[in-house]
Amino acid sequence: MVIDTHIRPALFSPICENKERFEKRCDQMNYHLMKPSSIELLKKQYALAGIEKVFLLPSDCSFETGEPDISNDEIEKIVQCDPTFFVGFASADPRKESAAEELEKAFKFQNLAGLYINTARLHMYPCDERLFVLYDICKKYKRPIIFQAGLSMENNSLAKYCRPIEFEEVLSKYPEVNICLSHVGWPWVQETAALLLKYENCYTNTALMNFDGPYQIYKKVFTEDMGALWVEHNIADKIMFGSGSPRIRPVRSKRGLDSLGFS
């Protein structure tokens, strides 16, 4: 089964009915010249890559923006369109006093599957004490965490807050929690590889598209930035497929990855 572990549903039509909110979301997340798409069309696009399940990642920086770019309620709404296909993740802005309560609600009542955090947007390091209450809730409910790692293309984001090595203490303190450092932590690819090798609970995904096309960037990252045999010999079971849609169509990501010929 092909699972896309990195979809940002900013353009999903069920949550784009309010034009002003849609435009604000696209501005915050740096999505431009894009239009909403129906669930039916999106699923046809996923089918071209053989994708049978997708992870939907929200965005909550509401402490500064006033409302989440993509809320937990909106994620829940999309999941309800096809619960066998969509897997919803939660987000909670740790700068808000209500963050822990919101995450508890997401896990206990909305049945969301994990937590997504973008520390680059939050302007805090992964070991900021305000985040630990959220990590504790993930541990309590046995839910994974997907972190933005490396460069974030979203507005008002600073990559220094999500350099892969900054996550090591969290990986060490929470061995029971599976943690994904997304985007292979690009451009700090070797730092990500080192953490994948050391920590059983550390994973990454292939959601990256920053230079060239998918054929070129994947070859550069997985056979040049890493040793040519690192993936096959050491960390193949730590790398999950993720397209990073809507910045790139999933079928392009999948074909680029397949071109490497990994078993």
Give the label of every model feature segment.
Residues 52-53, 61-161:
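Active-site gating/metal-coordination segments in enzymes
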Residues 108-114, 133, 137-144, 173-177, ...:
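Glycine-enriched alpha-helix->loop->beta-strand junction motifs that scaffold or abut catalytic
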Residues 178, 186-263:
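H/E-rich (His + Asp/Glu) clusters that bind or coordinate divalent metals
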Residues 10-13, 61-64, 94-98, 122, ...:
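Active-site environment of divalent metal-dependent phosphoester hydrolases
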Residues 66-69, 73, 98-107, 127-131, ...:
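Distinct, well-ordered alpha-helical segments
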Residues 3-7, 54-56, 86-90, 113-117, ...:
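Hydrophobic faces of well-ordered beta-strands that scaffold small-molecule active sites
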Residues 1-59, 64-66:
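An N-terminally biased module of ancient metal coordination in phosphate/nucleic-acid-related enzymes
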Residues 6, 46, 75, 106, ...:
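Conserved, mostly hydrophobic/aromatic
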